[in-house]
């Protein structure tokens, strides 16, 4: 149900009439993953089915020359949500943003969101990035109201007294150690 507003709107969007072209979460491929790092950091990723909607897409050729084919493919064709525990999120998906969560009091948290982009980005790509940001992440966008409701619900749930711990084991049956099919592996710092 999270991001229902976005998914529902996407199914009715008419790009021919000049609507903001967006990453299509409804048809994301089944290829996705979650990485857990030391000290509580983590990253979610998914492979896109429509990477041409991203502002970075027309830079694929240049990126292949600069960073190699595999890394360029990851930059252009995958989304990433990186959580730097405990309070910073670096997100590269529907657009690019940094979210900072700052506790104000025991029952209040400030969420600040910053859109970011490459310094050398063309005016056309910058405009596309900003429209996608406004479309999904802006306060009036399709995703942020749902996210803020999730934050509010979590905050309310943390006030519960009956349960000592928050169960975060969803998907635990699929956890694996070492590299996955993409060849990515976490580093323990011991190597």
Question: Positions of the model-derived regions?
Answer:
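C-terminal catalytic domain of Rieske-type non-heme iron oxygenases
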Residues: 1-191
């Amino acid at each position: 149900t999270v991001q229902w507003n976005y998914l529902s709107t996407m199914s009715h969007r008419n790009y021919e009439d000049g609507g903001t072209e967006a990453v299509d979460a409804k048809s994301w491929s089944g290829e996705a993953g979650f990485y857990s790092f030391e000290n509580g950091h983590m990253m979610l990723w998914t492979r896109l089915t429509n990477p041409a909607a991203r502002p970075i897409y027309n830079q694929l050729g240049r990126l292949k020359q600069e960073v190699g084919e595999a890394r360029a493919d990851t930059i252009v064709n995958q989304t990433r949500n990186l959580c730097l525990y405990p309070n910073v999120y670096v997100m590269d998906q529907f657009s690019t943003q940094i979210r900072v969560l700052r506790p104000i009091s025991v029952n209040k948290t400030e969420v600040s969101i910053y859109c970011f982009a490459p310094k050398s980005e063309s005016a056309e790509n910058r405009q596309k990035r900003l429209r996608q940001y406004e479309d999904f992440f802006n306060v009036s966008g399709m995703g942020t109201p749902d996210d803020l409701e999730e934050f509010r619900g979590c905050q309310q749930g943390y006030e519960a007294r009956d349960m000592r711990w928050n169960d975060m084991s969803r998907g635990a049956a699929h956890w694996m150690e070492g590299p996955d099919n993409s060849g990515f592996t976490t580093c323990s710092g011991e190597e």
